[in-house]
Swiss-Prot record:
Task performed by this protein: Co-chaperone involved in the maturation of iron-sulfur cluster-containing proteins. Seems to help targeting proteins to be folded toward HscA.
Protein name in UniProt: Co-chaperone protein HscB homolog
Entry-linked InterPro entries: DnaJ_domain, HscB, HscB_C_sf, HscB_oligo_C, J_dom_sf
Family: Belongs to the HscB family.
The entry's keywords: Chaperone
J domain boundaries: 2-74
Source organism of this protein record: Vibrio vulnificus (strain YJ016)
Length: 171
């Protein structure tokens, strides 16, 4: 049973987050190991395994990057944990320039506004890539979707770096 089947969801990138959460809570309740306290040792072990499977599946499906990676793996393209280098020099150059720009923001005269504008740009880029991934997955364009996921990972890392700069600037 795959993660989508476990939650009773269609195997697609776009999903209803609130439905996923409610299904997760329902499955958690149903298979919570405490419910099997008086059951046989075998049934208790199965309940623990099922609870772990439910938790793992939820973690994968709730995150758009891991959800896309999972969909790709379900279609024969395993990119989770891969060490393949990015083959798009223009994208890599853009990422380097964005990181350099982020490094300069704290030293500028209006760091707060500059960081907010920078964050908005990167968030827009992130959303555009998510939309492209959804389309590529819907169209079964697996290699293109895989490349887009690799790029989205770079952008997600940049978003995390923005948060770190924000914490340093504003505590």
């Amino acid at each position: 049973m795959n993660h989508f089947e476990l939650f009773g969801l269609p195997p697609q990138f776009s999903l209803d987050g609130s439905l996923l959460s409610s299904q997760f809570r329902e499955l958690q309740k149903r298979f919570h190991p405490d419910n099997f306290a008086t059951a046989s040792e075998r049934d208790r072990l199965l309940a623990v395994q099922k609870a772990a499977q439910i938790n793992d599946a939820y973690q994968v499906l709730k995150n758009p990057i891991s959800r896309a990676e999972y969909l790709l793996s379900q279609n024969g393209l395993e990119i989770r944990g891969e060490q393949q280098t990015m083959q798009d020099p223009m994208f890599l150059m853009e990422q380097m320039e964005l990181r350099e720009e982020l490094e300069e923001i704290p030293h500028g005269s209006d760091a707060e506004s500059a960081l907010a504008a920078f964050d908005a740009r990167v968030s827009k880029m992130y959303k555009q890539h998510l939309a492209s991934i959804e389309q590529e997955l819907n169209d079964a364009q697996w290699p293109q979707a895989a490349d887009r996921v690799r790029k989205l990972k770079f952008i997600a890392k940049l978003k995390n770096e923005i948060e770190l700069v924000e914490e340093k600037l504003f505590g």
